[in-house]
Amino acid sequence: MIKAEKLSYSFPQKELYNKVSFTIEDNVHCAFIGTNGTGKSTLVDMILHPDDHLYEGKLTMDVPGRIGYVSQFYSLDEEKEETVFTYLSETFVQLQNQINEICDAMATAEDLEPLMEKYQTVMDEFQAIDGDFYESNIHKQLKVAGLKDYEDKLLTHLSGGEFKLVQVIREMMISPKFIIMDEPDVFLDFEHLNALKDL
């Protein structure tokens, strides 16, 4: 649940919110609608990073688990030849590498207890995001998004709408309890917008 109570926030020469209150309950979809410059992205950033902003009122975030976030801005490294599959696999591969490193350390360690605790923590995190089946889950999600033949395609070769869908898939695959999308329909044509709804 996210709850704002009499939230006020302003820039030096512009007031964005004046005693705004709202509640976003669990298991619901909510959209903030407004023209450019009305503070939608600022509100998202306040929810994600409340300590970075000076505001009046109360902002409460009670989300027991991961929070996913899809930004409206993302710059790709044109020199980095990364495929869709590699991009979607990154979190899982990092956790697998951590598990392997811990196992290697356990082979020569005299005190196994701290390593066992670390191993269990990383393994729990891996299993919480269905890590054993991440490859098949990537296939399934790309198919739902209408991108089933895109696994080996370079990110730099995707259209804006295609990359937006891949971003959403990446966040959804870490099994967030709550996901925030800033301007999720940016770059999406009608076909890709329907694919976003299917995800």
Task: Enumerate the language-model features and the residues they cover.
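ABC ATP-binding cassette signature C-motif
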Residues: 1-199
